[in-house]
Amino acid sequence: TGISATNKLKFTLLGDPALKLPIPQLNIVITDIFNLNTNEQIDTLNALSTVKVKGAVLSEHGYVMNSFNGLLKSKVYDKPIKLQTLNNDFEDLEPFNFDLQQSILYAGNVSVEEGLFEFEFVVPQDISYVDGSGKFSFYAYNDEQDAIGAHVDIIISGFDEDAEVDNI
C-alpha cells in the first residue's frame, strides 16, 4: 500500500521534557494485614478470604503524618501475566515478551484520618492460582499534600478453607 513501517513510529512530545515531574514527597505503607476469617496476621491472600489492611501516611523521614487527613485510593492487583506483542508489521523482528499486572482484585477509596487508614475487602475466587506476588498500589491526597506507595511482597495463592459458605 506504499506506507513504510518506519513512518508509523514518528510522534511529537507535547510539553517541556526539562520540567521535573511532581512526585509526592509523602509515602504510604502497610502496617498490618489481617485475615478476618481467622483473626490472624497474614502474608498471603487466599481466594474468598476477608482481609483487613491497615496503613499509614509517612513523612520523608518515616514518621506518621498526624496532620494528614484526606482520601486514599487503593488498588490490589493479582500476579502479573506473561504477554507477547503481535508483530503486526511482519518484519524480521521477534515478538517482544513482557509481564503485565492488569487483573484488579480490589479498588476502593477510604478516608485517611490523622495519617492512618484501614479498609476491608474479600479476595475474589477467580484469582490466578499460579505461585507469585501481587501488588498493593496507593495514592492519598488532601487540599495541600499528596502521597504515594506500593507494596509488592504479598503472595496471592490458594483458597481460604475458613471462608464462610455463600448460600445465596
Where are these regions (language model features)?
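Short glycine/proline/serine/threonine-rich loop/turn segments at secondary-structure transition edges
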Residues: 125-135
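Surface-exposed coil/turn segments at beta-strand junctions on protein surfaces, enriched
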Residues: 46, 65, 101, 112-114, ...
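Beta-strand-rich interaction surfaces with strong enrichment in secreted/lumenal proteins
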Residues: 94-97, 105-112, 125
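Short, compositionally biased serine/threonine- and acidic-rich segments at solvent-exposed termini, linkers
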Residues: 137-168
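Short flexible loop/turn segments that cap and initiate beta-strands
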Residues: 58-93
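Surface-exposed loop/turn motifs at beta-strand-loop junctions within extracellular Ig-like
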Residues: 59, 78, 125, 140-144
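Caspase-like cysteine protease fold
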Residues: 1-62, 148-160
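Exposed aromatic-hydrophobic patches
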Residues: 118-124
